[in-house]
Structure formats: C-alpha cells, structure tokens
Regions:
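N-terminal Rossmann-like NAD(P) cofactor-binding module of classical short-chain dehydrogenase/reductase
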Residues: 72, 78-82, 103-104
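Rossmann-fold NAD(P)-binding glycine/threonine-rich loop
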Residues: 107-134
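C-terminal catalytic/substrate-binding lobe primarily of soluble NAD(P)-dependent oxidoreductases
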Residues: 156-400
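Rossmann-fold cofactor-recognition segment
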Residues: 49-64
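Conserved Rossmann-fold cofactor-binding substructure of NAD(P)-dependent oxidoreductases
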Residues: 61-77, 88
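Conserved N-terminal Rossmann-fold NAD(P)-binding element of oxidoreductases
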Residues: 4-11
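N-terminal Rossmann-fold NAD(P) dinucleotide-binding loop
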Residues: 13-17
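Helix N-cap at the beta1-alpha1 junction of Rossmann-like dinucleotide-binding domains, i.e.
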Residues: 36-39
Length: 400
C-alpha cells in the first residue's frame, strides 16, 4: 500500500515500528529516523528478516525544519508518524506542509521552556493543511487518542448527548525500582508537577497539583488512588462531544511515586529553569532524566496491568444512560510481543492504527483533526484486531 516515515526511536516508536511491520499489507515500507541513527539500525537488524515490510533508517534532527524537509523529499513517504518529543511537533508539521505529506502524532505541542501544553499551536495549522490537501491527525495515542475514540463511539451508538466524562488512567504495573517513569521522564514529571484542571460548564477550573484524589476499583487491577490532572484531550473533547457539562481526567499514582516526586521538587530537581553547573548551563529536569532508568528498559522487569477508559453519563431518548468503556493491557504480554511495557504499547498501537486509517483513506480529509472528529467504528474494530481489545460496562461505578 504505502510508506511511512517514523520519526523517533524511543519506547513508543519501538511499538509503532513492530506494529507497522506486522501490518505489511498497509505499510509496505517504513523509514525509521532519529537523531541517533544507531537506535534506528537496531530496530532494522531485529525486524528486517521477520517482516515483509522494507525497512530503511536515517539520521535527522527533528528540531531542524530544513533537515526534516530534506529527509521527507529523499524518502517520499505517504505519511509521517511523529513519535519524537512534543517540543518537535511544529517543526515536523512545518516539514509536512512544505512537502505536502500527511501527519500523525500522539501528543500535543508544548514549548520546551514552558510546562504548558495545549492544542492552539497545532490547531492554528488548520487552514494551511486544508489548502495543501493533506491530513494532520493529532493525538493518536491512548490518552489522548483511544480515549477520544471511546467518547466518539459512545456518542455515536449510545447517547443523544453526553453530559459528563471521566477519563480514568490506571497503571497497576510494578517495575521494581523505587522511582522511575513509564514514559519520557521529562514529559511525565512536567505533566504531574503541573496544576490540575478540568472543564465545567464551558470553563476551565484549576486545582493545585494532586489536590483532588479519588479511589477506584479497576477491573483486573484492583483498588487504586487516582488524582485529577490536566490532560490535553479535555480541550478537544469539550468542543467535539455534544452536551458536555463536565469533563475530568484522573491518573493513578502510588504513594512511593508521589513521595519521591515531592522530594525531587523540594530540592529543585524538577525545575525547567536553566542553572549554571561547573561553567555549563544545565536544566535540572533534563539532568534528572539522564540519571533515571530509561522507560524503554522497563519492559522485561514490569509486571501487572494497565486499565484505561472513559465513563460517560448522558441521555438517550430522554432517559439517563451510564456507560464505561476501557482496555486492560498486560505489561508482560506486551513485552513478549514487541519488547516493551504496556504504557508504550498502549500509545504505539493506536499511532499505527491512526496512520493506517489515514493511509487507507478511511480517515483522510484535508485539514487538522483530533481523533474524535472521525468515524470511530473502524478505529474500534482495529483496536480489537491489533492488540488493544476493549470492554463495555453499562452499569459502572461512577466517580463522585
């Protein structure tokens, strides 16, 4: 069918690469590009003899638009799958615009010098992508991504309007370290150290970090503490789902994780303000990232399961409806299949699916879109096929 250029070579990229290689009918060729080409070459060595997909590799600095344009012009992909850093979304989108190439990512843009992420920077590309006749699919990971598709599916099949959405992200995995993050430490710590927020009656309500805590009993995981965070899909779902009065996002954290994080905050290690150290300027959080375990190395030692889903409350034919749709993913099963833990797996599989739907024309439309703006059915079918089966509950325990 076609060729994908995959930018990035971390844990999520590894899953995308494996899944594209499993889906050779659609992805007849992939080029893996990263700042460190040796990482890309490792994937090629591991997979080339096991797949019909042709694999090439390249070196690129994703902060450099000219380098990106040159690479896209050289490789001529049908689509670019961006699994680099969120700071690099706009340079990659600029390169896609210049070369008229479709684009998919898993997380919205945030400036490197400000711990704030929102869609406004990427939504500003709408007219330019439309004019160029190309598609940008934003946030095709799990959350954001599958969570948006879950809500669109609920809206299409079970509701006339959805008034309340709670997105619950539970990681019941244990990697055995006193402190480590399941995805890029810099991005993860910025996210959980920031103020929380949710949308109520069209307005953002801000909370202190970890101020709002709830307990929830997750299927196949058990009772966990979860905390309200700011999360990017709230912004798009509030616009795209009919009838929304309130939308919140909760994520589980262990007491050990929170204690370590608080200690690191107290000594300044989570700061993104540059400091001078032995004549060099360093960012404490970037230094911390360098000494923490690489999330891509956690796969073999992580046991347990994730459970991520959406609880929707609303109305159908004048009657109240409650609906919970979620996926449970086993860390060790993911490792056996693609060599990663479930957090990378649950992000990487939907990135491949989103790219597949754009490439095959099912989700191909000029402009910039979030996942919930397309027909959810082909995506939901693909989740079952490609390793993220989902479960429905029509009588869920609600979050107060």
């Amino acid at each position: 069918m076609g060729k994908a250029l995959i930018i990035g070579a971390g844990g999520v990229a590894g899953v995308v690469i494996h899944k594209c290689c499993q889906n050779s009918e659609v992805f007849t060729e992939i080029c893996i590009a990263s700042r460190t080409k040796s990482k890309c070459d490792k994937f090629k060595e591991e997979l080339q003899d096991k797949t019909a997909t042709k694999i090439t590799t390249a070196q690129v600095d994703a902060n450099d638009v000219d380098q990106l344009i040159a690479l896209i012009e050289q490789e001529k992909p049908d689509i670019v799958i961006n699994v680099a850093l969120p700071y690099q979304d706009l340079t990659i989108m600029d390169a896609c615009l210049a070369t008229k190439t479709d684009y998919v990512d898993t997380a919205n843009y945030e400036p490197e010098d400000t711990a704030k992420f929102e869609y406004k920077w990427q939504w500003a590309y709408r007219e330019r992508f439309k004019k160029a006749g190309i598609t940008a699919l934003l946030g095709s990971g799990f959350d954001p991504g599958v969570t948006g598709v879950f809500c669109a599916y609920a809206q299409k099949h079970y509701f006339d309007e959805i008034n309340y959405i709670d997105i619950l992200d539970c990681n019941g995995g244990d990697h055995g370290y006193p402190f480590a993050t399941n995805f890029n430490p810099e991005i993860n710590i910025r996210e959980v150290s920031a103020k929380g927020s949710y949308i109520e009656n069209g307005e953002w309500v801000e909370t202190e970090p970890m101020e709002i805590k709830r307990e929830y009993n997750f299927d196949q995981v058990g009772e966990k503490d979860m905390y309200l965070l700011h999360h990017e899909e709230l912004e798009s779902l509030a616009l795209n789902i009919k009838g929304i009065k309130r939308i919140r996002f909760f994520m589980t954290f262990s007491q050990s994780y929170l204690t370590h994080l608080k200690c690191l905050e107290n000594v300044g290690m989570t700061s993104i303000e540059p400091i001078m150290f032995e004549g060099k300027e360093i960012v404490p959080l970037q230094f911390l990232k360098a000494v923490l375990p690489d999330p891509a190395s956690l796969g073999p030692r992580t046991v347990g399961k994730t459970n991520i889903g959406c609880i929707c409350q609303g109305v159908k034919d004048g009657k109240p409806v409650n609906y919970y749709v979620y996926n449970v993913c086993d860390h060790q099963e993911c490792y056996k299949e693609v060599g990663s833990q479930a957090v990378s797996y649950t992000t990487g599989v939907p990135a491949m699916i989103g790219a597949m739907l754009v490439m095959t024309g099912k989700w191909k439309k000029p402009g910039v879109y979030n996942v919930e703006e397309f027909d959810p059915d082909p995506f939901m079918d693909a989740l079952n096929k490609w390793g993220l089966p989902w479960t429905e509950n029509f009588d869920p325990v609600l979050v107060d």
